[in-house]
Amino acid sequence: METATVLIIFIASLLLGLTGYSIYTAFGPNSKELRDPFDDHED
């Protein structure tokens, strides 16, 4: 394989992993522990 192909596959898998982790963090079982800064700030 060429170096560019390996690099593209690595970057694509890294982006997919980060996206999957952020979705899991936002909507997963621990999402109930996240706080909303807009709810904490009263006008």
Curated annotation (Swiss-Prot):
<dbReference type="GO" id="GO:0009535">
    <property type="term" value="C:chloroplast thylakoid membrane"/>
</dbReference>
<dbReference type="InterPro" id="IPR003398">
    <property type="entry name" value="PSII_PsbN"/>
</dbReference>
<keyword id="KW-0793">Thylakoid</keyword>
<comment type="function">
    <text>May play a role in photosystem I and II biogenesis.</text>
</comment>
<comment type="similarity">
    <text>Belongs to the PsbN family.</text>
</comment>
<keyword id="KW-1133">Transmembrane helix</keyword>
<protein>
    <recommendedName>
        <fullName>Protein PsbN</fullName>
    </recommendedName>
</protein>
<keyword id="KW-0472">Membrane</keyword>
<feature type="transmembrane region" description="Helical">
    <location>
        <begin position="7"/>
        <end position="27"/>
    </location>
</feature>
<keyword id="KW-0812">Transmembrane</keyword>
<dbReference type="GO" id="GO:0015979">
    <property type="term" value="P:photosynthesis"/>
</dbReference>
<keyword id="KW-0934">Plastid</keyword>
<dbReference type="Pfam" id="PF02468">
    <property type="entry name" value="PsbN"/>
</dbReference>
<keyword id="KW-0150">Chloroplast</keyword>
